[in-house]
């Protein structure tokens, strides 16, 4: 049951992506357009050069905010910088308990923590294929004693929260997107996360998503994420989403909405 609860969060990470629906790329939403999904953050095109996003479902237990800003083109690539901030402490302390909702042992009290991330994104259309390169730096600040035994050793989760134990990390990746028809698109990506010096210092992540666009205001997505990496207990790999009780992988359906304000 503990893993089921936390894999609901992982679903947000699995689908966690002037081009609409391109959260993963250097393209910004058009001004006054918003988009959101069951697991995706709410995104809003504030201006022609600035887009912001928040995860509304998690905001009150894990305050978060992201800002994407367009930059000058480089070698024909559309470029943008992205900055993220997250305060995970309230949620982590919520799950530091015994029983069904407990994932972290109750003897651990998580101190105030702040996560910062800065990324550089470059996108370009090549022969009908949208290519995006990204890379950046992650910083984790713990304002108090953070016990190293309190790590959550689960795929996707460990290497994202590990930055608070390691103080810093690096991420880089490649995204390839192609529309195979007017309404159907395919997204394939490969991402690497590094936590130099930490036990369990890397995670290699691959994702495949297929989307059906009913209109510019609604789409349905399904797919999987494959994770391979090092953890405190050794090497591991997993196909996600994963249902622990059934000991099986199942595809997950994501619904997304969008609208342009006049």
PLM features: what roles do these ranges have?
Residues 27-42, 46-59, 65-67, 79-87, ...:
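Transmembrane beta-strand segments that form the barrel wall of outer-membrane beta-barrel proteins
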Residues 3-13:
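Sec-dependent N-terminal signal peptides
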Residues 22-25:
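Blade/loop signatures of beta-propeller domains
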Residues 20, 62-169, 173, 226-229, ...:
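Outer-membrane pore/translocation modules
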Residues 47-49, 72-74, 127-129, 179-183, ...:
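Outer-membrane beta-barrel channels and translocator barrels
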Residues 176:
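Cysteine-nucleophile amide-bond enzymes
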């Amino acid at each position: 049951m503990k893993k089921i609860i936390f894999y609901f969060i992982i679903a947000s990470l699995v689908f966690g992506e002037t081009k609409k629906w391109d959260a993963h790329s250097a393209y910004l939403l058009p001004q006054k357009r918003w988009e959101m999904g069951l697991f995706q953050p709410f995104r809003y095109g504030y201006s022609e050069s600035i887009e912001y996003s928040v995860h509304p479902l998690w905001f009150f237990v894990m305050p978060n905010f992201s800002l994407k800003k367009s930059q000058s083109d480089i070698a024909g690539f559309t470029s943008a910088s992205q900055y993220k901030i997250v305060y995970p402490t309230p949620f982590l302390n919520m799950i530091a308990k015994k029983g069904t909702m407990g994932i972290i042992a109750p003897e651990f009290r998580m101190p105030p923590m702040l996560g910062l991330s800065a990324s550089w994104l470059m996108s370009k259309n090549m022969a009908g294929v949208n290519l995006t390169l990204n890379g950046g730096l992650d910083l984790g600040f713990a304002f108090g004693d953070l016990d190293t035994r309190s790590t959550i050793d689960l795929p996707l989760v460990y290497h994202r929260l590990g930055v608070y134990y390691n103080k810093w990390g690096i991420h880089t990746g490649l995204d390839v997107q192609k529309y195979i028809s007017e309404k159907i698109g395919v997204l394939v990506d490969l991402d690497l996360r590094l936590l130099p010096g930490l036990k369990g210092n890397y995670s290699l992540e691959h994702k495949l998503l297929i989307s059906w666009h009913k209109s510019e205001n609604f789409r349905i997505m399904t797919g999987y994420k494959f994770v391979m990496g090092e953890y405190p207990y050794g090497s591991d790999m997993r196909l996600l989403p994963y249902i622990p009780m059934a000991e099986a992988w199942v595809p997950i359906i994501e619904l997304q909405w969008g609208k342009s304000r006049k």
